[in-house]
């Protein structure tokens, strides 16, 4: 089908504001030598560590220093000009007649998912019980340095470009909802394309049209249907529902969730070392699936291998939880699934029953 005259570009305002602000900001670190009080600036921590190895015969150690991050932002006008150019650029690239910008609100349903608290590094001599990390969804980003102008950039998008703020979901969910609704309307005869414009890899699993501004050579993609996974060197690429299934098994370290967290911590507690389960392993589980039933059975079987019996764990809220493989799978489906409509949620147990993977509960 040829592109109709009426085309709307839907833009992730979170992503674009962050990108524009980062491009207009220099960063460095200040290392303060605690015993002497002397300070020295470095471009980054790697440069600082190289300095420790090569200067003064390596007599300095990292624990003798306090590190603080410093930011050197350009004027806010530079950020706003960049955003204006980015919007105009993507509209031209997809031949859009209009655009809509979406920004995440203060709340997010995924923050309520009772992910395990024990998202930790292994026990070691310095930390016999392991080192506790954040367990809440996306909490690993909590201490990351945010661009100085980020808040003002989002306010600009709202005031000058009519950006809408989401409720109880992230901007990428709202993009998915908008794109899915547009694709369904299109299949029913609507003479309009709705094109989510984002570099977010999760968008590859949404049934909609899609444009990645970072990869213009891919053009306007159509992620309809079951999709596929493809080996590309060391990486696995994919689209359609197969890409969602891939994420459900792999997890996402950027968003701070891993379906093997509970298993890995139990293995460490028992004195063992968990075996790695990366992209290639996930691909091997899903590569022969021919339809959705195959994929759901493969995912369920893998979760049952990880959690053959009901397990107990401590959530990030310090609650003791007891869950079986399906309940655990539900958590990670909730993390990975982008909403197709408001309050959209895949019920794992019902889906497995519908697919005939497990017997219907009475």
Model-derived features: positions:
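Extended two-metal-dependent nuclease catalytic cores across DNA- and RNA-processing enzymes
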Residues: 96, 123-361
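Noncatalytic, basic helical substrate-engagement surface that gates or grips nucleic-acid strands
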Residues: 2-191, 197, 208-221
């Amino acid at each position: 089908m040829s592109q109709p005259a009426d085309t709307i570009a839907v833009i992730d305002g979170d992503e674009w504001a962050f990108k524009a602000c980062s491009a207009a900001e220099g960063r460095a670190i200040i290392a303060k030598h605690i015993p002497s009080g002397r300070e020295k600036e470095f471009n980054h921590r790697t440069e600082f560590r190289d300095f420790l190895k090569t200067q003064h015969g390596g007599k300095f150690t990292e624990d003798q220093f306090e590190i603080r991050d410093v930011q050197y932002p350009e004027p806010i006008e530079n950020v706003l000009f960049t955003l204006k150019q980015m919007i105009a650029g993507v509209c031209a690239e997809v031949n859009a007649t209009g655009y809509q910008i979406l920004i995440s609100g203060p709340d997010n349903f995924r923050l309520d998912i009772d992910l395990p608290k024990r998202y930790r590094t292994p026990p070691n001599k310095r930390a016999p019980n392991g080192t506790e990390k954040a367990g809440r969804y996306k909490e690993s980003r909590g201490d990351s340095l945010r661009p100085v102008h980020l808040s003002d950039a989002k306010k600009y998008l709202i005031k000058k470009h009519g950006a809408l703020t989401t409720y109880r979901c992230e901007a990428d969910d709202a993009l998915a909802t908008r794109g899915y609704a547009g694709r369904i309307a299109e299949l029913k005869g609507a003479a309009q394309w709705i094109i989510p414009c984002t570099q977010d890899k999760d968008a590859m699993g949404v049934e909609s049209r899609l444009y990645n501004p970072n990869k213009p050579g891919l053009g306007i993609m159509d992620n309809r249907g079951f999709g596929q996974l493809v080996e590309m060197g060391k990486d696995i690429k994919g689209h359609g529902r197969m890409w969602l299934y891939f994420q459900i098994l792999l997890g996402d370290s950027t968003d701070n969730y891993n379906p093997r967290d509970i298993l890995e911590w139990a293995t460490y507690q028992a004195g063992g070392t968990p075996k790695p389960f990366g992209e290639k392993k996930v691909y091997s589980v899903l590569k022969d699936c021919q339809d959705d039933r195959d994929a759901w059975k493969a995912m369920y079987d893998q979760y049952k291998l990880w959690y053959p019996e009901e397990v107990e764990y401590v959530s990030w809220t310090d609650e003791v939880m007891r869950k079986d493989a399906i309940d655990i799978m539900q958590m990670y489906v909730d993390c990975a699934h982008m909403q197709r409509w408001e309050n959209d949620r895949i019920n794992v147990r019902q889906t497995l029953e519908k697919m005939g993977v497990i017997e219907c509960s009475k």
